């Protein structure tokens, strides 16, 4: 029951009225309308009064107030009924529908739009792009269908001139994934004729007033609605709707939905074709019928993408097949005009049906598998024309009012009749409430052989000329005794009925007088086959696809098509079956006045609607009845977790006893009744309380299930990981063994090979053994080197180590490293035999004095002294010192440098013998080896390798630089040494430069 509204606004729910009477009902309805409260409840039925003004009650903030709330928690609103239908669909996995009923102008179309808006707003919380696309297309489809299916009438500026039922499909999470639209009985006669004060369909005026000038020129259209006969008949060219703005909105909506540019252009070409058809004039020349404004024929040919002569022939002639003979029968003036109007109506109807079909192709659910995606549930929204009583009521109004009778019958069946019958069947104490059952009126229209539709179809099938008057006579003969049918012949004193024209039906909503003029013609819905062939043969593929029957041969015999009445009756029966299969929610719309005033509440006008809608009976049934009923197994299935006696399964004698125990435990036994197979719950508050308790328990159950399931998953994951680890370990062992076996096989006899297995190709190791392979290769290489070195003498071993050190350090940095010759080391003893004895004597004295173990290297050098002068000296390097000697003074030692004071050496990348010894005290020694025998021998590689090998044996690091120029420090001053090649130079020599020194060497 509704809450949160003070008594100044009246009773929000009519069930709460103090006295259930028509006077009380009307007084409450009027009070709420005057206070701006346009929505009220009758239990779970929403009563909506058209406010005839914009109201600020549909924004995002209002949507949030109703999202997920129960009906009685918030004031009455369309959003509440939409949320209730959505929750029922989501909670119970059951299809639901919202039936919006009321007469023309009561606000049904607007109500359906707000319901769609609400459903779109509350779904897709995760903002999935595909769901957003579907929602957007569903909303935009309303805009397109209104443009082509709605029109201004004397009662309503935006009256639906067709019936629309939309199914919205939802996935198991409750997000929209598609939809489907069914359309019913477009009032196509409005294309060529409108009553005084009315307009044709919005689309025509939107095109004329809103299309760009260039587009109008291409369509041969003027920006003046009065220039076109078909749309100026009603004399009402203005509307509260902005046609120019709506044109752009509709075009944009069609693009969003997915119409191609070519399809949109074809739509506007068809609209232009209809406008031009209305201006087509026929004349006669004797017995020959002519087109007076023949220029329009070429325009029509252009718009229809067909030949001009074919258009003219279809307008003036009809092809008749008699056996094998085919003749062209010329139309009379009347037949040509009839054919033109029939073509205009048929083209527009086909266009509208094609638009609906195109929208369905785009928005329908595709590739949905319930086994994979869960059950596909549906919410249906019915927005169909309301009950109509015009000054002149024809075939269309008859069908529309029959439709409303069927919907009223459904309401009676589900809300009034079935509910009371169910109480009696279940043994619930109940006082019967009388109501008017309109089944007798439905039978009057649709009963086989006797109903009005049956009589009309029979008249249309008779051979010979059958007139509307003959049809009326047949009705009078068959329905003379029917309480809800009369005519002037049956009621001679009733002067409101015309002889041989009118009949009256007493509908549930009141008496309606119908004119039979046009009934036969509209029921036959005749369109010459010539027009169908003309349009099928169009070069426009979209237009061609609309007329598939045009491909039939002229001589082909076809079955008689179903009449318009039969088609409509079948569609209504199908619609009612569809609605009856779903859980219905009702919106009953009331029109407060006929002048569209936001202030006027016409008491008698509203009272009549309340009576024929059966709202008072609805209040009585709802007040005496129960809001909810469920079978015992279904109730237990949903709520058994609330009670310890029923969770997880009960051990009581029956489900009924289990439900009783559950409700007693919750304290609700005063608000329920127990039937034979169902439990009946009186108020929504009890259901809401049960849902709250269930939601709380579901959280706990879910947490428990999550804990158990996560534990199960963890154990499964652990077992899989452990099994995988065992397999991985076993596989690794296998791969390691396989690899090692292969290595052993390949290197089995390497000791006996000449190259000790150097040519053997290593097997590819598994990834896990790559580092192992590197270590194994290193071990092999060390073994291979050892096998080579093992036979050598200690002296040769030392030489080999020095050469390896040179190669590792200088490979690729100097051209000649001297690796191919034997390294002597002590060259002063070898290169100068005449002075060798003096050198040996001095060397022995130094060994005794400084206690060095061996001579690493000796050579004659050219050096720079501290006065920046070049001089010849001898260089002796032992394992402890670096000695400078004067060869001219019997190799007298000049100065020694402790070897531990040497930090590095620098050499150039050329063939010169320049070497710079870097020291810790920045007093570097710059020398150039000379006096080599043979001449041109390179000893730099030997010097560097010998020093590297010695430093490595002492676990010290020697920095070796191969650069040019060489940077060094001389007597604490930074300088550079540059090597230059000179052709005239006979011996290497140093000269002073601005930045340091230049070593000039002989060159080619």
From Swiss-Prot:
Biological process according to GO: actin filament organization; actin filament-based movement; determination of liver left/right asymmetry; determination of pancreatic left/right asymmetry; endocytosis; epithelial cilium movement involved in determination of left/right asymmetry; establishment of left/right asymmetry; heart jogging
Localisation per UniProt entry: Cytoplasm; Perikaryon; Cell projection, Dendrite; Early endosome
Domain TH1 as annotated: residue spans: 812-1003
Keyword annotations of the record: Actin-binding, ATP-binding, Calmodulin-binding, Cell projection, Cytoplasm, Developmental protein, Endosome, Motor protein, Myosin, Nucleotide-binding, Protein transport, Repeat, Transport
Residues at which ATP binds: 102-109
Annotated knockout phenotype: Morpholino knockdown of the protein causes situs inversus, a left-right asymmetry defect where organs are placed at a position corresponding to the mirror image of the normal body plan. Causes laterality defects at the level of the heart, viscera and brain. Morpholino knockdown of the protein leads to the formation of a Kupffer's vesicle with reduced volume and dismorphic shape. Morpholino knockdown of the protein interferes with the normal cellular remodeling that gives rise to anterior-posterior asymmetry of Kupffer's vesicle.
Record's keyword annotation contains Cytoplasm: yes
Main location: cytoplasm
Ranges for region Actin-binding: 572-594
Entry GO terms, CC: actin cytoskeleton; cell cortex; cytoplasm; dendrite; early endosome; extracellular region; microvillus; myosin complex
Gene3D superfamilies assigned: 1.10.10.820, 1.20.5.4820, 1.20.58.530, Kinesin motor domain (3.40.850.10), Myosin VI head, motor domain, U50 subdomain (1.20.120.720)
Molecular-function GO terms, alphabetical: actin filament binding; ATP binding; calmodulin binding; microfilament motor activity
Subunit structure and binding partners: Interacts (via the two IQ motifs) with calmodulin. Interacts with F-actin.
Family recorded in the similarity comment: Belongs to the TRAFAC class myosin-kinesin ATPase superfamily. Myosin family.
Domain comment in the entry: Binds a calmodulin chain via each of the two IQ domains. IQ domain 1 mediates interaction with calmodulin both in the presence and in the absence of Ca(2+). IQ domain 2 mediates interaction with calmodulin in the presence of Ca(2+).
Purpose of the protein: Unconventional myosin that functions as actin-based motor protein with ATPase activity. Plays a role in the formation of Kupffer's vesicle, an organ that functions as a left-right organizer during embryogenesis. Plays a role in vesicular trafficking events that are required for normal lumen expansion of Kupffer's vesicle. Required for normal orientation of cilia in Kupffer's vesicle, and thus for normal, unidirectional circular flow and normal angular flow velocity, which then mediates asymmetric gene expression and left-right asymmetric development.
Additional information: Agents that activate cftr increase the size of Kupffer's vesicle in myo1d mutants. Expansion of the lumen size is not sufficient to restore the normal spherical shape of Kupffer's vesicle and rescue laterality defects. Heterologous expression of rat Myo1d can complement the defects in Kupffer's vesicle lumen size and anterior-posterior cell shape changes.
Name of this chain's protein: Unconventional myosin-Id
Species annotation: Danio rerio
Phylogenetic placement of the source organism: Eukaryota, Metazoa, Chordata, Craniata, Vertebrata
